Amino acid sequence: RCRTTRLRLGQALALGCGVLLAGCGDGPGGDGIGSAIFSEVRVIGGRGNGPGRFVKPRSVAVDRDDNVYVCDMTGRIQKFDPDGNYLLQWQMPEIERGRPKGMALDHEGNIVVVEPHYSRINHFTPEGKLVSQWGVHGREKGQLSFPRAVAIAPDGAAYVSEFQVVERLQKFAPARESVQVEIRGAGHGPREFNRAEGLSLDDAGNLYVADSCNHRVQVFDGDGAFLREHGGPGAARGEFSYPYDVRVDEQGRQYVCEFGNSRVTVLDADDQVLEVIGGAGSAPGRFNNPWSLALDSRGNLYVADSQNHRVQKLIRREPASEFQLSSSPN
């Protein structure tokens, strides 16, 4: 809880994972989803417990080979190839207290998964082998209390956001032996948080925080100095309703996933809105309480469309030669 309180379908592309292609041709920029940036949508999954199906997916990540990892409410991590074909899965070690939420790629190519209810961070190989686990429960500096998101810098430093017991952002040194930055405080002012749900690093090392219950994005430099904020509660352009995640590409474009408005807002490096994608619904290109975002090396955007029990892949219009993802692993 917060403290304050006509789209044409193409043929199926894969087997049991249910990948569907949505053609785009009648919206702004010639796009049926109303996007000048993305040309089409691929729908991965659907409700179910079998391979390639999901129960409320809440986190998504992409590795160096553009394979996709999805975490859902069953506590599974499922891996798909870049075309959405199911490859493998593994189960989190414990789910009795609560389910995992929050994923990233670390500097060694491992998949990082956050367990809020266990106050710990896990690093898995792309095949699902647990290689590292860290975090000590508590409110003190260097401890973790209900962590929600993680971002890993190129040098291995880890940014972690927490909420509920303590509203906080910490930057852990690469070896986790010390905390280099702690920003702590519940509230609505700069450097204060109300359920920070998503984190992303840009190419310059600046950190973007989806401050969900404050309905805004805050931006800090790598040392925790406040740079700016944008947003505010609402449904107009430039306003947000419970932004649960944010991603930044090499051009500085920001992609903000709004749980409340069931849409993705795209902004430029100056925080000006470029376009708004989606809206509530179950058709391809529409969302129902999306939770998480990920970008691949071609600039394609993955959306964990939670209440529709699927992941949507928005295919970028630009050829790969014109777009390169940031070297940051997030």
Regions found by a protein language model. Name each.
Residues 1-13:
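Bacterial N-terminal signal peptides that target proteins for export
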Residues 10-22:
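Bacterial N-terminal signal peptides
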Residues 24-330:
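Eukaryotic scaffold repeat domains enriched in small/polar residues
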